[in-house]
Regions:
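Short glycine/proline-enriched loop/turn "hinge" motifs that connect secondary-structure elements
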Residues: 42-44, 77-82, 152-156
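Small/polar-rich, solvent-exposed N-terminal microdomains that initiate assembly or binding
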Residues: 1-66, 128
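Short, cationic low-complexity segments
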Residues: 73-79, 177-191
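Short conserved micro-motifs at the rims of enzyme active sites and ligand-binding pockets
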Residues: 61-63, 172-176
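Active-site-adjacent structural patch at catalytic or cofactor/ligand-binding sites
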Residues: 51-59, 63-93
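Acidic-leaning, charged glycine-interspersed low-complexity segments
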Residues: 102, 112-169
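"Short basic amphipathic alpha-helical interaction patches in structured regions
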Residues: 64-69, 100-108, 122-125
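A generic structural motif
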Residues: 91-98, 168
């Protein structure tokens, strides 16, 4: 689901930017900021880069379910659905600084307009994803961004961080099947 959510966000942002600036080529890439050897990947040049920087499990469990009723009335016992928040670093990487700022501004506009992506706003949302919410992460300012870029092994670039909320990861494993309880009378067993 993580890959599907990132690919969908990439495609949706890419289409927005292509429409806004009248572009024919793709301008958004989901990729790491720096290769293992410390260089900027070629595919990142003159692109808006989306990279996953953190994953956290959603701790509010009121929407989780463990048992699912089957057509025959019995229940399927599966592991709990788990929901995660993904932290995305969005960094335009253009040779011209003005282009970097232009695409950063347009990216912020995209997430302001599309704070929620679901089937009502996009018919192309992937199967298994019902809703994605995006929340701007203000963090602790300059020092936090400096530390992040240092940890990534890269030079700072103008960028923003968004929290993508509630990506559900569901296990396909079934733990057990359980019979349903049928009550046919109000009598107790002792009667």
């Amino acid at each position: 689901m993580i890959l599907k959510a990132l690919q969908f966000t990439n495609r949706t942002l890419n289409q927005f930017l292509k429409n806004k600036f009248g572009l024919s080529d793709d301008v958004v890439v989901t990729n790491k900021i720096i290769d293992q050897n410390g260089t900027v990947p070629i595919e990142n040049q003159n692109k808006v880069i989306i990279t996953l920087i953190h994953v956290e499990q959603e701790t509010v469990k009121s929407f989780y379910r463990k048992n699912k009723q089957l057509n025959d009335g019995n229940y399927e016992n599966k592991p709990l659905d788990e929901r995660y928040n993904l932290y995305l670093l969005v960094a335009p990487n253009f040779e011209q600084y003005n282009e970097t700022l232009k695409f950063l501004n347009a990216t912020i506009q995209f997430f302001q307009i599309n704070g929620v992506l679901d089937a009502n706003t996009s018919s192309k949302i992937p199967k298994g994803i019902s809703r994605l919410e995006f929340e701007f992460e203000k963090g602790d300012g300059y020092l936090q961004m400096h530390n992040l870029w240092s940890a990534l092994g890269a030079k700072y670039q103008p960028s923003v961080i968004y929290k993508m909320r509630l990506v559900t990861i569901v296990s396909d494993e079934i733990n057990a099947f359980e019979s349903s309880v049928n009550v046919t009378s109000n009598r107790t067993i002792d009667d």
